[in-house]
Amino acid sequence: MIIVKLFTCLLMVSSVLTLNDVRYKYYKTEKVGNKCRYNMFSYLENDESIYEDRLCKMYTCHIMEDDALMQHSMCKLPKGFREGCTVESKTGRFPYCCLNRKMSCPPEERNDDFNVVSVKGPKFPRNKSNDKFKNLSVKNCPCLE
């Protein structure tokens, strides 16, 4: 009985350690003067570095929490655009992604099991509240350099 309890305890500890070792990134943005400040976190960790995008002058930002573990940054875009999200690009920049019905996901970023699509970062399961994420593109975004 004691051996079973010890084994169960070890399993629980190892699962917690595994959870904390996840290396996905996600981004938080906030309005700072006429700029958007990007806070980059390792997913489930707290190593933070700050990036500023000088081109983000028109956005007011807020944080959307899908659940306790996943946070996603949302900003209001200028007229003619839908909501957008920040993703990590393959070039290492942190572009602003624009959501627009005319845009579609680049093939390498598609994941048919999820609506939110990014090169790296959290992906949210498909449900009605996430329908707006069906057409996500990193192309033709106003904040890209």
Curated annotation (Swiss-Prot):
One GO location term (cellular component): extracellular region
Subcellular location(s) of the protein: Secreted
RNA-binding recorded as keyword: no
Predominant location: secreted
Secretion signal, residue range per the UniProt entry: 1-18
Keywords: Disulfide bond, Secreted, Signal
Identification of the protein by name: Venom protein 30.1
Organism: Lychas mucronatus
